[in-house]
Amino acid sequence: WPPLHPLYRTDLSLEAAIEEEANRLDPLVQQANLLIDTAALSTHELAERLREFLSGHSDKELKIVVESFGFKYGIPLDADYVFDVRFLPNPHWNQGLRPLTGLDDEVANS
């Protein structure tokens, strides 16, 4: 099974955990300069949106590196921006992609 929501507890349902997350994030949402609905975006489309927002245009002059890491090991030292993207589909949970790595085209393009 995929990992549970970070706020999920035995005394808090998944639905309540998601609502609690929304409540906790609301102050950030109120101050955000940009909100992106990622429900239908691929990682490539997300990178394009971020590139356009950060540089003012979608030309590929701005390089965006998407790197996976575990918070328990700390944020990568060379990161300028860090986004929590646990909401994106994880290829590990797709049986056809599980044996592959991010270097494989099937994973990179999913």
Swiss-Prot record:
Taxonomic placement: Bacteria, Pseudomonadati, Pseudomonadota, Gammaproteobacteria, Pasteurellales
Q: Which domain of life is it from?
A: Bacteria
User: In Gene Ontology terms, what is one molecular function of this protein?
Assistant: GTP binding
Report the family membership. Answer: Belongs to the RapZ-like family.
Q: Does the keyword GTP-binding belong to this entry?
A: yes
Protein name (database record): Nucleotide-binding protein HI1146 homolog
Kindly give the PANTHER family that the UniProt entry links to this protein.
RNASE ADAPTER PROTEIN RAPZ
Q: Name one Pfam family in it.
A: PapZ_C
Which function does this protein serve? Displays ATPase and GTPase activities.
Q: Which keywords belong to this entry?
A: ATP-binding, GTP-binding, Nucleotide-binding
User: Cross-referenced InterPro entries, in alphabetical order?
Assistant: RapZ-like, RapZ-like_N, RapZ_C
